[in-house]
Every structure is written in structure tokens, then in C-alpha cells.
Amino acid sequence: MSGRRCAGGGAACASAAAEAVEPAARELFEACRNGDVERVKRLVTPEKVNSRDTAGRKSTPLHFAAGFGRKDVVEYLLQNGANVQARDDGGLIPLHNACSFGHAEVVNLLLRHGADPNARDNWNYTPLHEAAIKGKIDVCIVLLQHGAEPTIRNTDGRTALDLADPSAKAVLTGEYKKDELLESARSGNEEKMMALLTPLNVNCHASDGRKSTPLHLAAGYNRVKIVQLLLQHGADVHAKDKGDLVPLHNACSYGHYEVTELLVKHGACVNAMDLWQFTPLHEAASKNRVEVCSLLLSYGADPTLLNCHNKSAIDLAPTPQLKERLAYEFKGHSLLQAAREADVTRIKKHLSLEMVNFKHPQTHETALHCAAASPYPKRKQICELLLRKGANINEKTKEFLTPLHVASEKAHNDVVEVVVKHEAKVNALDNLGQTSLHRAAYCGHLQTCRLLLSYGCDPNIISLQGFTALQMGNENVQQLLQEGISLGNSEADRQLLEAAKAGDVETVKKLCTVQSVNCRDIEGRQSTPLHFAAGYNRVSVVEYLLQHGADVHAKDKGGLVPLHNACSYGHYEVAELLVKHGAVVNVADLWKFTPLHEAAAKGKYEICKLLLQHGADPTKKNRDGNTPLDLVKDGDTDIQDLLRGDAALLDAAKKGCLARVKKLSSPDNVNCRDTQGRHSTPLHLAAGYNNLEVAEYLLQHGADVNAQDKGGLIPLHNAASYGHVDVAALLIKYNACVNATDKWAFTPLHEAAQKGRTQLCALLLAHGADPTLKNQEGQTPLDLVSADDVSALLTAAMPPSALPSCYKPQVLNGVRSPGATADALSSGPSSPSSLSAASSLDNLSGSFSELSSVVSSSGTEGASSLEKKEVPGVDFSITQFVRNLGLEHLMDIFEREQITLDVLVEMGHKELKEIGINAYGHRHKLIKGVERLISGQQGLNPYLTLNTSGSGTILIDLSPDDKEFQSVEEEMQSTVREHRDGGHAGGIFNRYNILKIQKVCNKKLWERYTHRRKEVSEENHNHANERMLFHGSPFVNAIIHKGFDERHAYIGGMFGAGIYFAENSSKSNQYVYGIGGGTGCPVHKDRSCYICHRQLLFCRVTLGKSFLQFSAMKMAHSPPGHHSVTGRPSVNGLALAEYVIYRGEQAYPEYLITYQIMRPEGMVDG
């Protein structure tokens, strides 16, 4: 700060500066500085009001007064012409000074007089930077309320939030007094809410409860004024709470009609669904909110949508009357919508004698009114159909408009003729006392006025305001009504104009000459034959006229060219012809309306599309300052999206509107950028907002899965940060880089770990995410972890060498099997257990995202014996340990006191003496024996160390001569099979090199398993159905310490969120580095590596009553009445059997097998 300005941002150096200028100016500056308003009034003149402190920072009097918070002086200076945007030497405006020193009232005053809240000084500091740096909370709020942009960066690239004092940070994150804001919305305290409301917190969510936004609360408590204010300030009508309820759900549930109307008028989705697929109409119908139901139906609510219980809103209606009303009004609104769109097929579907005169509950429109107003070409046919069915031709709306009024106002002359011929009352009056002629005259529809006059409409009727039709018309209409139709043109020209209008191409050919081709309608709008032909959609006439010299640029009296006419009435072929013949698409009439303005205002989607394709500028403004987008009617969302261009696609992707995305996306814009924000692509937004279907569609149509935004984030970062598992899995399927880094070297795994996204972490690790990568601060994902589950997951995945000591797992390792000598206890295994977590998986299928395998128990005698053999707890080895020390006589004490080996390692002399071992020598021998067992000189596994918790894991090395070793090895070797993928996932091999087999002993896990086995056996007629099965996973380390954990299972597996096992070791081998082999071994990234050691578990699994399944079935739990699922091989399904359990305690990791796959004989590298 000090390097870019005087201390105080201009104000504090005021005094010194004032001393160095001429006396008169110095006196004025001093008066402003001291707040002496009387002296200021005496000294200020128009010449001096913006004088400069030439000896200082070239500040103005307003700079001084603002910096010192002299509100009265500031007000006087502004009233007398002080320049609110004046800049000093450092580029500061008075607002900078006021903000820097926290003068909130002065800030308000300056902003009201037009001060720019985003003005930047020479270092790109805005007033918000100033206020934030100094911790001026009130000023920050005022600035944000007046449009200050918090994302602006100074020349150092820092935003206001980056530089903010701790006290102001909460304002810039939207967290400042969030609870008070939410309470004010709930209680209806407007003053309190407006004092706190900013664009940064208008959509904040409560930290507890239902995670409601202010709009949720205001809607639920019927705070109409609060709802209006929130909507005016950008509240999101689509915001969802914890149960996916939108504010409209709340308003409808409690029957708040006005709030409901406000929300739907601001675009709330009337068919939005919560987590249970309840729509707002479900809520209103179930609570018997009759009027709200009617309102929702009028805005397109569908009462046939089903919730999660397969119940529609009609089903939930508590009374027969409401059920009937819902069905009736739904049919009626469907008929009205079909009439608006002039859709003959849908009209015939919904039309009946009962429905033909259905009236809109709010506007009282009938289908005939809607058809009369329809811009579509089949409106005449629809009107005739309705009239044949008995539509009331003189029915009036709430404003007393008849169908004739509506058609006349729209200049739909074809409908005017139809309804008049069916005896419509031509002089019917609306609520303003106006006839159809009044409305046609007011809109300047000359031909409509002629038509109405010809049918006997009285031009002398006076409206309630005292006007006749003549008085309301423009010059042409007035002339028509006063004098009748004049024949100012020559008879030949008149006939040519009429022929062009009527589409009589033969007459046009006969009369058209070089002189007459561009003749004018003298009595009318000075239109040419091309104007008429274009406006009346006479394609063949237009084509002929253009070929014979018609001026495509000719303007009528209002500055309209033929293209204006064609676009206004939606004549696509004509417009296309005119453009091909050189019509200027950005030409403007006298009111600066372009053809795009006309087409947009009239809802002509295809015309808008054509014009934009040929270079029409959607940013051009008419005389009223409106762009084409500003003129689009509320219901024309397709045109709004078209005109918004890339912004509409980004919005649709963000809101998850698949239909809009399909309509708006193309190969040219599928990777467009949010240029006003983070330069996100549609895929970034779809991923961040969990819009799975949209993300999938974008990826299928060329979206760049690894596109980076301004911060270097790819879509996978967004999905990972917000915990969107399904979206993340989809992105990975389309080859998203799981180790991509942003500008701060954060990977998706950093994001997921920091936010406690357990499922996401499991998914990323399973697909090759590297947990050792560090961000710019030198932090791994484990350093940022915020949840215990995530911590356990990352710890299991980290190579032991990369783990901090506090995270290293603890285990007793190197214990020999019974029968080993005493020396063996002091010489542990020479090769370490490679319990490192391997890379990734292609699909998450089970616990910790691993798909597991199993060994067939029917293969060998050894397997059968293994299944029958009980696995004792840790205490089985205490007898052998004591015997090896020659202290067998102490076993009675150990058995009496229930001392197991894991308890013994925690005991010292005092504890041993207390249980009755009085001889010092015996105690010493026991303690030293334990020390030798666990000391670093025993060749302990570098990945596993002592756990002193009393519930740790002991790994017991089996001797290759041991029958148990040989039985397990035989199971491994005999269950190798050739797989359909040709070795892609698990490598190319036909046998293993078994390096080590260790028995896993964990008393806690064993007791948990046996308890569950007993439960299953009791539930299955005393038959546990226990099997010895293989399990492959990159998380072996976590499993042998903590057991299997179904909480980390992912629903994306073939049989849902279970833990998977297999009979064949080669199948489990496919998953030791992740699903599909992940990225291969950690060192060589090779799925067929013959060097690196692998590890597999041979597990005891209780299957109980198993459900046989041949095809994929997504389940979160075992099928009812069953304990597991058995996936059987089939022609188009599995090649080898799979076994799935859904509770981790149904399996015990009995053997840890360390091995290598062996290269087949005769196979060469490459």
C-alpha cells in the first residue's frame, strides 16, 4: 500500500499538500478537510469546485471531504458541480478515499451521485479493495449492494478477498451474519435483510437444518415483500435445499398463492422434483391447496408425473372434487397451449364438447382467444375447427376482450374474417370501452381497419377515455377513417400492388415493368410491391420481383425494408430469398428496429436463427435502448436462448436442462467459454452442478474432457470438489486426466480430500490418482484431509515411504508359524511385504472401490482343508512364544489372566509382577523376547510396524515346507485361467512365482467375522456356506488392518455397492492395481510387469443364502432374504463366477500372498 500512495489513500496527506498551494485554494482544501461547511459555501465557485491540489496528489476538494468523512461538505460540493469521477495522481476517485477510511454514509452519497463502484486506480485497486484491506465491513456491504465486482484483480493479480482484513473476509465470502440474514428472511424483517443482503449472500445456504436459502424461508413463511426483494436482487428460484426442494415447493406446500405466483413469473420450474420426486403440484395437491394447484396447472404443471412411490398429484389429492379439477384443468390447459401453437394434431387430441369453452382460471382466455392470437400459420384452421365444435365466439377474457379484439390487435386478418363470418359482434366493447377497430387503429393496422369497416364496425364509438378509433390511429388510419380509401396511385400501379399482396403472380408478370417494379403505395405506407409480397408471404411473387429489378433495400414511410416485413410475420422462405439477394440483415427503420428486433419481438425462432447465421447483430439497440433480446416475450425461451448464444448454452449446462443443451449445442460451441466468469466450458458447469445427463450429452458430442478454465481446473476438479461421484466416473470414462493440476498444482484428489468426499477419493484412487502429488504449498491430499474415512483411504493408498510417521500403520510382522525355532523368532523374513497401494481401477465395484476375486474351493484337497480350518485369534501364538523361551510353566498364569501376545507386548515388570510372575529373570526374559520380536533388527516389514493398541494385526510367515503354504500355493496356481481381454488387465502369464504367504491374525476382525458367521448360519438353517475365495485390491494394507468396509463401496459395480470375490486367482489378479489393471505397477506403469511384487488376499467368506444372478443388477444391499449375490457365468455376461457380499464383516482376510506373475515360455519382450 505504501508503495503506491500516501498513507491514508490521499486523505492523510491532505494537510501537508494544502500547505504548498495558493492561499485561496489552501483555505478551501482546509475547510473541506475540517468539515467547515459554512467556509466551503463561502469559498466554492463553479471555477473552484473542481480545483486541484497542484502541490500534492492533485486531489479535488471532494477528495478531501470524502477522505475525512465530511458528509455535509460532500453533499454541498456534489450539488454545486463537483466531479464525482475526478482522479488524483494515483488514479483515486473520491470514492476510494471514503471507502479506505470507512465513511459508509459518504460512500452511499457518492454512489447515489453516480460514483463508479468499480473504478480502478493506477494499480487497479477498486474501492472494494480499499474497504476490504482496512476491514470496513459496512462499506464493503454498501459497495456490493451497488454493484461492486469482487472478482476484479489489482496489478498483482489479487482480488479484494485475497487482500481483505480477517474481519471483512466473511462479507466477501457471503458468510457475514448469514444466520441473521436467513432469520430476517424467515421473519419478514425487510430493513434487517436489506442491510445485510449482497449479491454474494443472496443465495447462501443455512449451515444446518435443511440447508435452506433466504428464498426458501421467505417462500415457506409467506413473506411476499421479502420474496419480491430477493428476486429483484438475484435470488435463484432453482436453488435446492438438502432434500432438493426448491422455494416453489415450500410456497405450494403451505398454499401461499401470491408467493407461488411471484416465483413462477420469475421462471421457477413448476415440475421441479425433490429427492423423492415430489413436484410442487404434489405438495399443493396433497395439502388440498386448490387455488395454488390451479395456478400451477396454468403455468404448465403436469399432474401425471409420478413420485418415488409411483403416485401422481391426482393420486395424492385428498378429495374427489380436487382429483376431478386437476384432471379437468390439465386437459384444458393442454388445449389452450395447443391452440397457442396452432398444433392441429394436439387440438384434435384434447378437443371435446366439454373442453371447447374451457376458460383459463386466471385470464379467462378460451382456446379461441389463444388461436386468434397465435403467430403460427394454421391458426385459421384451428379457429374454424373450434367454431365447428361449438366455441363461444363472443366469449370475453378478464379484460373483456373477445376473439375479434385479439385478432384485430394482432392484425391476424385471416382470423378476423373467420370470426366475423361466424357472426362475431363487431362492435363489442372491452373493459376500456374500446371496439376491435379502436385496437386495430391504435396499432396502426391499416388493412385490419379496412376489413373491420367493411364488416360494419362503427368508427364513431367513443371509448371510456373519450376517444374514437380515428383519434387513436396514426396518420394513415386517420386518413382512412376520414376520407375512405383513396385512389392516389395510377390504376396500373394500384393493381400491381394488389396483385403482389394477393400473390397473383400472373397479374404481376403482366403489369410489372422497369418503371413500375418499385412503385409506391402512395395512400399507405409508401410500400413497394416487394414490401407487400414479402409481408404476405407470396414466395413466387417475391422471386419474380427480385429477378426483375425490385429494390431489396427500398424503405417505406417508417424506414422498413421488405426484410422487416418478412421477418415480422415469420415468412422464412421469403426472408431467405431476400438475404440471398443482398438484403442487409442489420438495416434499421426510423425507430432503429432491425429485422432481428422484429423477428424476436414476434417470436419467430427460425427467422432469428436465419438472421444470426447471416451476421445479424444481437447487441444492436433500438431507439428505446432495447436489444432484440429485451423484446422477446417471457414465454419465448427458445428465442431468448438463441439470442444469448454461448451464454444460454452455459446457463442450460449449469441448470441441467438437457433439452435446451441439445437445442443450443453444436460442434462450434460445445467448448465455448464463460468469458465473464472463470472461462468455464459447459462441461465444467455440468460437472460442478452435478448434471449427469447434460455432461454425458456434451461428452458424446465433442466436449473437451480436459479443458482448463482460468484457474487451470478441468471438469473433473469441479466434480471432485463437490462430491459428484457419478459425474466424476463419467468424466473418467471419457479419459479425464485424474492427475491434472490447476495453477496451484491442486489435483482432483486434493479437492476431494479437502472437502471430505470419501466416494470421490475412492473413485480417483481406483483410476490412478497419485496420492503423493503435492500442490504449490508442498501439501499432499493427505495433508489437506478433513474426514477420518478419507484419511484412512489415503493412508492405505500412499506408499509407506511417503507417509508421515503419524500415519504409518502398525503391525506385528515376521512371526514364524508354530514349529519354528527360537532362533527363527529373532530372524524375521528377509524380504519385505510390499503392501503399497497400487494404482487405479477402471470401474469401482466394491469395498474401497476394489473388485475382488476368489479361489475355487472345489479344485483341490488343500482348499477343502483350508475351509475346514478355524482361524484363531491373535492369542494362538502365545503358547509357542512362551515355549520358545523355555517358560512353559507360566502358561497357567497367561491362560488364567487371558494374556494374549498383543497384550503381552504392552506389559512391563510391574504389570507382569501383578499377575503373579515374581521371578525377575522370568520377567526379564519375557520382555527381552518381545523386544527381539518387534525390534528393527528382526528384518521387519518396512511398511508395517508395531501396533500397541491391543487390537493390531500380526502377519505370520508360513514356511514353504508347511502344508498350509503348499495348499494356498496350489490354489493360486491351479486357478489361473485365460481371460477374454487377452491379459490386458492382469498381464500375460500362465503361472506365478509365490514369494511369500503370510497368515493374517487380528483378534478384533476375527471376532467380528465369527459373530457375523454365526448370525448368517442361524438365518440359513445352520448353514453358513463358508468359502475360501480370492480378493484383489490396491487397498490390501487397509483391509488387513481394518477389515473389509462396505461403506466405501460404489454403486457402479456390476452387482452394485458390494465387496467382490472370485474363485480364480487370475481374476483377482486383474484388480491388484485397480479395476481393469488400473495403470499397472507403480514403478513401471505396466499391467504385465514381471518384476514388481504383487499382493493378493485369500479370504474366508460367509455367503449364507446366495442370490443367483446372470446379468447386471445395481443393489446397495443383499436381496431380501439373502446374504450375498453369486454372479454366474453366461454367454453375454460373466466369463468366471463372482461372489458379492454387502457387509464387510462377512469376510476375513486370512492369507496375504506376495507373488510375481511369470512370463510364459517362449514369449519375448514387446
UniProtKB/Swiss-Prot annotation:
Binding sites annotated in the UniProt record for Zn(2+): C1081, H1084, C1089, C1092
Keyword Endoplasmic reticulum on entry: no
Ranges of the ANK repeats in the UniProt entry: 57-89, 90-122, 123-155, 210-242, 243-275, 276-308, 363-398, 399-431, 432-464, 525-557, 558-590, 591-623, 678-710, 711-743, 744-776
One Gene Ontology CC term in the entry: nucleus
GO molecular function terms listed in the Swiss-Prot or TrEMBL record: enzyme binding; metal ion binding; NAD+ poly-ADP-ribosyltransferase activity; NAD+-protein mono-ADP-ribosyltransferase activity; NAD+-protein-aspartate ADP-ribosyltransferase activity; NAD+-protein-glutamate ADP-ribosyltransferase activity; nucleotidyltransferase activity
Post-translational modification (record): Ubiquitinated at 'Lys-48' and 'Lys-63' by RNF146 when auto-poly-ADP-ribosylated; this leads to degradation. Deubiquitinated by USP25; leading to stabilization. ADP-ribosylated (-auto). Poly-ADP-ribosylated protein is recognized by RNF146, followed by ubiquitination.
Activity regulation behaviour: Specifically inhibited by XAV939, a small molecule, leading to inhibit the Wnt signaling pathway by stabilizing AXIN1 and AXIN2. Inhibited by talazoparib.
Pfam families, alphabetized: Ank (PF00023), Ank_2 (PF12796), Ank_3 (PF13606), PARP (PF00644), SAM_2 (PF07647)
Region (Disordered): 819-839
Protein name, per record: Poly [ADP-ribose] polymerase tankyrase-2
Primary gene name: TNKS2
